[in-house]
């Protein structure tokens, strides 16, 4: 079942993405992120993470480096966000 969802995303990468151009504001791209998340966490958690990432893909989000989390728990995600904010503050100073 995982293979089917990954095949759908890879089809998008091959058929549709070249027509839209390289517009992703994140690294890895949203489609690569979705594939990695599905491979790591399975269909449901992977799709959740991928769709959550897609919801951030808009002009008002700064983008940047956003790898698939090493664990998929709300507490870990909050800690990751806090760490990212601390790093941004260090860069400003």
From Swiss-Prot:
Could you tell me which residues belong to the region Disordered?
A: 66-93
Keywords of the record = Cell inner membrane, Cell membrane, Membrane
Is Glycoprotein a UniProt keyword of this protein? no
Q: Where in the cell is it found?
A: Cell inner membrane
State whether keyword Cell inner membrane applies.
Answer: yes
Q: Show the coiled coil region(s).
A: none
What top-level branch of life does the organism fall under?
A: Bacteria
Topology of this chain in the membrane:
Peripheral membrane protein
What protein family is recorded? Belongs to the UPF0161 family.
What does this protein do, in the record's words?
Answer: Could be involved in insertion of integral membrane proteins into the membrane.
Report the PANTHER family cross-referenced here: MEMBRANE PROTEIN INSERTION EFFICIENCY FACTOR-RELATED
The protein's name: Putative membrane protein insertion efficiency factor
